[in-house]
């Protein structure tokens, strides 16, 4: 074990403050607690606070004796106490939490049981509220007392999950098995139905449909298990009651079925001779043969199921092993790129050179430790609901002696602000299918208002409408809540913009109607609330000297690693298996790759419900070859004689005419080789293709071949040089079977050559498509719509047509009719930068990083993304987060050498006489200097002359003032107990 000993007073003080657990209860990554009860602690808290739990006075005293400040006076002899009463003795006074089935009032647990959401490291849990109101020391005590009390209760009561808890009753077992068998039969039906559709269905759609169907089976069976498991079952207590360990998925895999195994986000592929395993027939697509495990862990897997399950598990283990190194390297690159960023005394974020990277940290200037999630209900309410909930009625206006004009203006302003935030939320993330109503604010308004909420309280009716509005404006403009140090007109506007969400929160939680009639507040109480909000905001503003760059690097680096490590816990869950695709994409974005692997364009229509137009645009962009339309292809050698044979009859019966010649030779008798190609009518109609298109594209294809003949490889050149002429004929689009004849005259031939020619015509002739676009997909995505007049959310979600193209070709997209040119979305950051500029590129960076992390289940505050993207774009060019990007940041030689290629940087610095000003974090650490951040961002100056001329005075009224001397470290004294060791360095 290693020991770390502070070598100076400053070092010991920083260790004492920074490394102290009570100061690390909330994490900056997502502003949520990172310390809380886990596993047995959560289970014990749940069991102790159940409604039917009671303990006698002796047990109560035993449990309370484990707490730091036991309140024994509350316990009377020979009396029973509920678990809620016992636990309430350790909740600090003044803590309030009111949720649907849970209520704590002034430190008393009145309703509900504790679980993971209330006692663990979760947002707006009791731990979060205690920390927010009472601080770190009281929170540390509360967590310690909780752990001691609930674990000792578990010792008294006993709790274990055993083999007997794995069994379910016969009726539930039959219900689960019936669901599985029914779904497997449905799966056979779906396969038959799709196979009958033949070429009209996309193979990927076919696979995705089958996979989604089987994934839903797992969720349904797990729900049956959850609904029918007895409440006393220890699995139920641990997983569904306390939510301490495991999920419905884990319990379901033990008792019902393991479910569909996923490899690389897809069903198990038929890799060996058209089979997944040797146990199954050729080209078998049924659920059981493609990775569905119908058995559960209790009854054990069949042989082939075990193989499938191993495939899913192996993928997770390999990903974990291979990607851990790359994710660790990502975090190191982030740390080295961001380590110099700090908040300065004018509120800006600057690097070691003093260059401004951000005018306001994270776009809101708030310390990430101090933010809290608040629900803003107005986001989802209609105009009428807002008027009803936040505007006063005529009787209330009369009762409170308030002006109707003032009330109308307040409601109107609230509706306008809500509308603006709705639009900005959807546009910023290009997500129109969901609306979020919970936001991080610098003040926990819900907690503060809960402390003062008491509808039964009697109070003087002295709180006026206009006074509430004045105080809301005062909170927003008071110097305690300033975000910018120097104020000017444009900064006033910026400050107002940065506080928009906070303004909406204040207008909702401090609305005059709620304050006067719901909270029943008087003027004195309201003033206390205003002061609480001001002081909470002041604490929340980020402090000068804060090293926000390193905080951002760790907040983004840790989720990147976690995205990858979580995989092994979900072997068999499709959604988690595909999440690992996020790590390569994150590397791609941070490295500013010029050629990304999967360039994508999202196209939206002007008329969002025009499905016909969406289909047309998709068909235009989709790459379509002759091979995609073929129902049959044959090769004939026909000499064009008049003999009455079967071949002549067959070719004449096709009724082909209207010849398109390949070159100037137009004698059809010279072209004996016939490629007879039958096309599928339904596919042609679906893809909007006619025979004229096919013939034209074949002739143009041959023309391009002839033009490129000189630059061709020898083998391909010999193939096409053999053609001396040809003609393309077709019947009519109205014919029963659309047919094409390609007749060729060859100088010499062999059969492999004939086959190659036919394959080339089938696979290389593109009938539709756009250069640079390898494919496209037409889908309908949910779009939430709000009524312009009423502001209400539509009861049924609307769907808009979205075309996703695999590739980018802006010139072609610009001329597409019906496409909304203002809503095109490209995922290639470099392309956006070159075309639209640095601000557009910054926006894409934020959106792409957010989407990638969200897909992997990683959660962190938006502010961290803003810091990273601002660093990548503050120079006006895109700075990559790697060794190439550091050169654009104008770092000094020592700082550059601390990252990579150390000797190269030192040699260059020596050859070109470069100077290091020792301002960067790495440079100062190398030279033993204090870094220019935190307590090193300022210096203390002492007037020694005043000190020399001063004298000590006794205060005859207060007594002599005692000064504490320097404290020696007890640990050092024990180690160096012989007294001969030089300990001067301690002081």
Per-region residue spans from a language model:
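Short, charged/polar, low-complexity loop and linker segments
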Residues: 120-130, 196-201, 309-315
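Short alpha-helical scaffolding segments that buttress acidic/His motifs in well-ordered protein cores
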Residues: 146, 150, 255, 307-311, ...
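Active-site-flanking segments in enzyme catalytic domains
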Residues: 14
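Extended, well-ordered alpha-helical scaffold/bundle regions in very large, multi-domain proteins
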Residues: 143, 149, 153-236, 240-247, ...
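Hydrophobic/aromatic-lined pockets within catalytic cores
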Residues: 6, 20-23, 47-51, 147, ...
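Secondary-structure capping and boundary motifs in well-ordered enzyme cores
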Residues: 34-35, 119, 138-139, 172-179, ...
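Intrinsically disordered, low-complexity regulatory segments
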Residues: 2, 10-11, 20-115, 123-144, ...
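Polyanion-binding loop/helix "lid" in catalytic or ligand-binding cores
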Residues: 17-37, 286-322
């Amino acid at each position: 074990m290693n020991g770390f000993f502070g070598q100076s007073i400053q070092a010991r003080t920083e260790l004492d403050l920074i490394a102290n657990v009570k100061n690390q209860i909330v994490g900056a990554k997502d502003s949520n607690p990172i310390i809380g009860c886990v596993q047995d602690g959560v289970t014990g808290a749940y069991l102790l606070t159940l409604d039917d739990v009671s303990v006698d006075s002796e047990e109560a005293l035993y449990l309370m004796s484990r707490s730091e400040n036991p309140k024994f006076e509350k316990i009377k002899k020979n009396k029973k106490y509920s678990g809620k009463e016992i636990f309430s003795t350790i909740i600090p006074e003044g803590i309030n939490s009111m949720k649907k089935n849970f209520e704590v009032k002034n430190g008393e647990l009145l309703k509900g049981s504790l679980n993971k959401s209330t006692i663990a490291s979760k947002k707006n849990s009791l731990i979060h509220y205690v920390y927010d109101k009472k601080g770190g020391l009281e929170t540390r005590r509360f967590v310690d007392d909780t752990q001691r009390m609930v674990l000792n209760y578990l010792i008294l009561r006993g709790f274990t999950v055993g083999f007997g808890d794995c069994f379910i009753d016969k009726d539930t077992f039959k219900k689960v098995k019936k669901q599985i068998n029914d779904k497997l039969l449905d799966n056979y039906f779906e396969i038959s139905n799709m196979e009958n559709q033949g070429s009209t269905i996309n193979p990927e759609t076919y696979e995705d449909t089958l996979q989604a169907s089987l994934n839903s089976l797992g969720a349904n069976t797990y729900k049956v298990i959850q609904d029918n498991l007895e409440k006393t079952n220890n699995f139920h207590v641990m997983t569904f009651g306390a939510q301490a360990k495991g999920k419905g998925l884990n319990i379901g895999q033990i008792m019902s079925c393991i479910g569909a195994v996923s490899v690389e986000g897809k069903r198990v592929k038929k890799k060996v001779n058209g089979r997944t395993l040797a146990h199954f027939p050729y080209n078998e697509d049924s659920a059981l043969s493609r990775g569905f495990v119908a058995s559960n862990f209790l009854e054990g897997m069949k042989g082939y199921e075990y193989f499938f399950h191993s495939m899913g598990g192996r993928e997770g283990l390999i990903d974990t092993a291979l990607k851990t190194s790359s994710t660790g390297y990502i975090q190191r690159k982030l740390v080295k790129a961001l380590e110099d960023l700090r908040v300065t005394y004018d509120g800006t974020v600057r690097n070691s050179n003093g260059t401004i990277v951000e005018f306001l940290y994270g776009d809101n200037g708030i310390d990430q430790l101090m933010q809290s999630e608040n629900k803003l209900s107005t986001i989802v309410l209609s105009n009428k609901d807002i008027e009803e909930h936040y505007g006063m009625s005529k009787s209330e206006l009369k009762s409170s002696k308030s002006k109707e004009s003032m009330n109308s203006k307040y409601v109107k302003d609230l509706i306008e602000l809500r509308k603006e935030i709705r639009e900005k939320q959807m546009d910023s993330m290009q997500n129109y299918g969901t609306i979020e109503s919970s936001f991080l604010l610098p003040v926990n308004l819900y907690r503060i208002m809960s402390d003062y909420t008491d509808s039964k309280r009697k109070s003087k009716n002295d709180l006026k409408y206009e006074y509430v509005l004045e105080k809301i404006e005062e909170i927003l403009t008071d110097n305690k809540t300033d975000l910018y140090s120097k104020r000017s007109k444009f900064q006033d506007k910026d400050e107002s913009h940065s506080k928009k969400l906070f303004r909406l929160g204040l207008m909702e939680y401090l609305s005059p109607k709620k304050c006067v009639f719901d909270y029943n507040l008087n003027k004195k109480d309201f003033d206390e609330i205003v002061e609480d909000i001001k002081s909470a905001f002041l604490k929340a503003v980020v402090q000068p000297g804060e090293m926000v760059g390193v905080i951002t690097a760790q907040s983004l680096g840790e989720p990147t690693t976690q995205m990858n490590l979580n995989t092994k816990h979900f072997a068999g869950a499709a959604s988690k298996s595909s999440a690992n695709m996020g790590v390569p994409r994150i590397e791609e974005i941070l490295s500013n790759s010029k050629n990304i692997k999967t360039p994508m364009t999202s196209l939206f229509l002007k008329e969002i419900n025009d499905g016909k137009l969406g289909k047309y645009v998709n068909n235009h962009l989709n790459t379509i070859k002759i091979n995609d339309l073929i129902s049959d292809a044959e090769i004939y050698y026909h000499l064009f004689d008049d003999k009455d044979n079967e071949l002549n009859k067959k070719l004449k019966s096709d009724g082909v005419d209207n010849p398109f010649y390949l070159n100037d030779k137009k004698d059809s008798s010279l072209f004996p080789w016939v490629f007879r190609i039958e096309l599928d009518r339904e596919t042609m109609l679906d893809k909007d293709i006619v025979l004229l298109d096919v013939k034209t594209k074949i002739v143009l294809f041959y023309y391009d071949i002839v033009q490129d003949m000189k630059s061709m490889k020898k083998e391909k050149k010999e193939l096409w040089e053999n053609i001396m002429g040809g003609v393309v004929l077709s019947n009519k689009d109205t014919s029963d079977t659309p047919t094409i004849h390609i007749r060729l005259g060859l100088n010499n031939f062999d059969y492999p050559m004939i086959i190659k020619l036919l394959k080339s015509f089938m696979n290389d002739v593109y009938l539709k498509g756009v250069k640079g676009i390898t494919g496209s997909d037409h889908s309908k995505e949910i779009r939430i719509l709000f009524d312009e007049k009423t502001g209400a959310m539509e009861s049924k979600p609307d769907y808009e047509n979205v075309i996703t193209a695999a590739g980018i070709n802006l010139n072609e997209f610009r001329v597409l009719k019906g496409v909304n040119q203002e809503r095109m979305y490209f995922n290639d950051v470099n392309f956006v930068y070159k075309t639209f500029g640095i601000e557009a590129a910054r926006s894409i960076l934020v959106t792409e990083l957010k989407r990638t992390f969200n897909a992997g289940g990683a959660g962190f505050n938006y502010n961290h993304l803003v810091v990273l993207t601002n660093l990548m774009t503050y120079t006006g060019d895109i700075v990559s987060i790697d060794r190439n990007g550091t050169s654009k940041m104008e770092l000094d030689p020592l700082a550059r050498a601390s990252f990579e290629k150390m000797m190269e940087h030192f040699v260059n610095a020596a050859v070109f006489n470069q100077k290091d000003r020792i301002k960067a974090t790495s440079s100062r650490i190398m030279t033993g200097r204090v870094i220019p951040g935190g307590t090193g961002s300022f210096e203390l100056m002492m007037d020694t002359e005043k000190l020399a001329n001063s004298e000590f005075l006794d205060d005859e009224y207060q007594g002599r003032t005692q000064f504490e001397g320097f404290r020696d470290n007890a640990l050092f004294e024990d180690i160096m107990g012989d007294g001969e060791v030089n300990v001067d360095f301690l002081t």
